[in-house]
Amino acid sequence: MAGMRMAAPLMALRSGQSEAAVGVLLALFALTQVFLALPAGRYADAHGLKRPVMWSVLMAFVGAGLAALWPIFPVLCVSALLTGGATGGAIIALQRHVGRAVKDTAQMKQAFSWLSIGPAFSNFIGPFTAGLLIDHAGFQWAYAAMAVLPLLGWLCIRHTRELPPVIKPEGHEKNRA
């Protein structure tokens, strides 16, 4: 998402969109996260790590792929919604998995330290790669590369061992946020 969040506004400004339109475009990257946070958490609780991340990878791939195929402002807006929501869903599933996988406080500190490095690395590699590709090959190639990056993430976690589901005690009321 970070590469898309950098490239899409640049393309929008270059194509003559107003600053207000670009502001809306940037806001769309967060909008789906607002509305999907609770359902994504419930989905991760019900299905573990891999299925929510698989859906997130698919959403990010489609979002960036659409921008690569049709780099026009309305499609960039759809791409922002898809890639933003995908990022939020994946992070929720990963945080849930890591929190359940640790056995003690020391492991928790180490695991969440590593988990925080992931988004930081993504916030570097995405915009850096997109910027280089925009300069040397154009926006469409940058968007295509941003579509491939989530697939690489999937390759990293596809063999992760799923944790057993959480068994709720009998008579446990369904909590709703």
What are these regions, as identified by a protein language model?
Residues 81-118:
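Cytoplasmic helix-loop-helix junction between adjacent transmembrane helices
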Residues 37-48, 134:
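Helix-to-loop junctions at the C-terminal end of transmembrane segments
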Residues 51-65, 147:
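Structural signature of the two symmetry-related core transmembrane helices
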Residues 16, 48, 69-74:
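Helix-breaking motifs and short loop linkers at transmembrane-helix boundaries and internal kinks
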Residues 142-158:
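Symmetry-related core transmembrane helices of the 12-TM Major Facilitator Superfamily/SLC fold
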Residues 30-38, 123-124:
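Residue-level signature of mid-helix packing/kink "hotspots" within the transmembrane helices
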Residues 74-82:
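Paired small-residue
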Residues 1-30:
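Helix-loop boundary and gating motifs at the non-cytosolic
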